[in-house]
Amino acid sequence: MQDERPVDQLTEAEAAAELARLAEAIEAANTAYHTHDAPQISDADYDALKVRNRAIEEQFPELRRSDSPSDRVGGALAEGFAKVRHDVRMLSLENAFDLAEVEDWIERIRRYLGHVGDLLFTAEPKIDGLSLSLRYEKGRLVQAATRGDGETGENVTENARTIADLPTELDGAPDLLEVRGEVYMSHEDFAALNGRQEAAGQRLFANPRNAAAGSLRQLDPAVTASRPLRFFAYAWGAHSEPLAATQHEAIARLAALGFATNPLTRLCTGPEELLAQHAQIERQRAALGYDIDGVVYKVDDLALQRRLGFRASTPRWAIAHKFAAQLAWTQLEGIDIQVGRTGALSPVARLKPVTVGGVVVANATLHNEDYIAGRDSKGQEIRGGKDIRVGDWVQVYRAGDVIPKVADVDLDRRPEGAAPYRFPETCPECGSEAIREPGDSVRRCTGGLICPAQQVERLKHFVSRAAFDIEGLGAKQVEALWRDGWIRQPADIFELPNRYRDGMQRLENREGWGRKSAENLFAAIEARRRIALHRLIFALGIRHVGETTATLLATHYGSWAAFEAAMTRAEVGAGPEWQDLLSIDGVGAVLATSLVTAFHQEAERAAVDALAAHLTVEDAEVRAPVASPVAGKIVVFTGTLEKMSRAEAKARAEALGAKVSGSVSARTDLVVAGPGAGSKAKQAAALGIETIDEDGWLRLIGDA
């Protein structure tokens, strides 16, 4: 259920449900963008999800999830590459969308530092590509790695060596230097690459960012070498000696070492100069020849950067000031309904083709039934209450080069006789009833596994990169094999070698296949008979269970036998198994109901049992919890802290596993009170909550 009310109007239960929804949506977006190089929502929509998630966490800190999207960077790693642990984490950036948010960021920096003088900042274009870390030892490139999840990336060293403007040897560099930057593809090179792809009958790339990411993450370096990739350096990680004293001097040093750096980088003082540079770069955007989606501001003084440090997933000393979405008007020619793997009926606008930001757009998302009607299930208006009808002139926006969205409708140009759109109440694929649960904005097919669309989409999900990742069995192959009746459920995939290696029907005889490709697929299938528990749970495609949740479940239950037994015995709303499931941080009643219901549906259970018979499931790796006296506790700071700033205290507490709240409640575990502590200290005393001073806090955490 999507709740679009202001955060301060949410109850605690509503906030918890909204955080669960946001975590699922953000995780799905991260997986599509970082792991599959195939983003499914716009940058603007993604940013809105992150902003709302953080706002709810700040309002309800005690509800902050252990798998909070605010703490995550990037997505899951692809199979086929060796893993690389980053010596210095590769983090994402906080976003700003207007001058007020930039000014707020600068003010937060001043408060954190206790700084009242002028601050210098660098401003540079935010390249829309793939982050890459390059490790040089004694001046020689020894390792290249993608960002991955920020902690661990993929080793793409041999592929990176093929990038023409990336030096493999440095003269005069520190003995150890890790250079970071962005791999991208120019518009001209992207058009030429897609031309070659089309001529060869191969799939076209959606945009330059996808082309760059897909090209760098090729298992065959020869493929990468054939793709025209480029690289801009903008940062550094591990190093044996400092590059310079300031950001702009360090970038100049990288340029002197032979790296391409962005010529539009400028030194600025204060928000007015930053905004002027943002406007200047945005005016030049269309003529740059490569994609950018904003301007990055960084504190120039590296000593101040070190003092400011980091939050869980972003540096305090940098922010990305994003560009507004690109807009165009066109006519809505029709509305098509697509059915997803969970049965969701998703409306898609069929548009008269229009150019938006240099790309021809013919389709756009309409989200759901309420979005078309202009009013949600609670009667609140969407777009001022204007509904969308076939024949309307609609405003389309596109941000981040992904699926465009219909943003508005021009009622003055509505054709006479245009009828209100009636959303189907039956599934267009199988004819089953399509229902809406109370409060849900999505209508879903009730056909389950008898619905062909759900069968196909769930099979695609099953073989996706974060699930079983069976090499040689992608979405197109799944569709073709399903269409001809060769596979209907996941277990059928593991029967392919037995059924179609020999005999009258052979995989190698199908169009697009041969003996070698068939044997390669059979070998890949055999290799996946052994699977990690979290991958299997995710691969089942149960609604609300994303990658992060699957990992939480795997860690909690430890083995497939324990997980399966618990789900089988559990009853929705009652019993020890149900309570145990709800005890997992990050699992709420909605998610738990979805899990338990799936394991009690006859068709679903039969499909799971048939699949499990083919597999050896590896037990989960159990990690030791953070050893800290405040891990898992809710801490409130009040009054004046004399030995550290409030921001530093909060950062230290969170690093030790505590949750820092801005208000005292019955769930608060500890209050740290300095001079001038007022109502919060009194409230803590009234509730019997332990209260200590700053020295006591430092002794408790071992910093005295």
From Swiss-Prot:
E.C. code: 6.5.1.2
Domain BRCT intervals: 625-704
Record-level GO cellular component terms: cytosol
Binding residues annotated for NAD(+), in chain numbering: 43-47, 92-93, 124, 147, 182, 298, 322
UniProt enzyme class: ligase
Cofactor: Mg(2+); Mn(2+)
One GO term (biological process): DNA repair
Keyword tRNA processing appears in the UniProt entry: no
Source species, domain of life: Bacteria
Active site, renumbered: 126 (n6-amp-lysine intermediate)
Coiled-coil features, chain-numbered ranges: none
Presence of keyword Metal-binding: yes
SMART domains: BRCT (SM00292), LIGANc (SM00532)
Molecular-function annotations in GO: DNA ligase (NAD+) activity; metal ion binding
Binding locations of Zn(2+): 427, 430, 445, 451
Keyword set, alphabetical order: DNA damage, DNA repair, DNA replication, Ligase, Magnesium, Manganese, Metal-binding, NAD, Zinc
Transmembrane segments: none
Catalytic activity: NAD(+) + (deoxyribonucleotide)n-3'-hydroxyl + 5'-phospho-(deoxyribonucleotide)m = (deoxyribonucleotide)n+m + AMP + beta-nicotinamide D-nucleotide
Pfam families linked to this entry: BRCT, DNA_ligase_aden, DNA_ligase_OB, DNA_ligase_ZBD, HHH_2
Function in brief: DNA ligase that catalyzes the formation of phosphodiester linkages between 5'-phosphoryl and 3'-hydroxyl groups in double-stranded DNA using NAD as a coenzyme and as the energy source for the reaction. It is essential for DNA replication and repair of damaged DNA.
Family in the record: Belongs to the NAD-dependent DNA ligase family. LigA subfamily.
PANTHER family recorded: CHROMOSOME TRANSMISSION FIDELITY FACTOR 18, DNA LIGASE
Name of protein: DNA ligase
Lineage, broadest ranks: Bacteria, Pseudomonadati, Pseudomonadota, Alphaproteobacteria, Rhodobacterales
